[in-house]
Amino acid sequence: MTKNKKIIFVFIVLIFILLMLFIAKTRRENKIEYPEFETNGQSIYLPTYIPDGYSVKSVRVSDGMTTAEFTDGSEVICFVEIRSTDVSIDIDDEDYETKKAELGSKYGFLSEWDDRKIFTYTDEISTVSISGKLKNKEIEKIVKSIKLYS
């Protein structure tokens, strides 16, 4: 094998290793195993990522609204998707701090009190709310992971 062929071979092996690492990381992040539930014929969106230690507590689908709860045994993360863009968002500044925020490439409102947060945004098809004892980075990961459930 010539020197150039060895360099090309090593380069291809490195690319292959990086690709395998990327695939392994992607599979770890898409780890939610949802129990079987009735979608009532609706197209619904759910996160494919939740923080480590959490599992699905419940999923409910009814008349244009999907609610999923995740728990780690003591804390709960709540995901709500309402299939409407005409939902008004009530901002209560007296009980907790609320500000405009961009998380996971979505613009919305982030409310904080103690160590709990609620991030609510509206996109082209729905209004989504994610709440729980979460850091902003975790909310971003959840937002970016929301996909059509199939």
Where are these regions (language model features)?
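Hydrophobic membrane-insertion alpha-helices, especially the h-region
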Residues: F9-I23
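Short, flexible turn/loop "capping" segments at secondary-structure junctions
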Residues: F119-E124
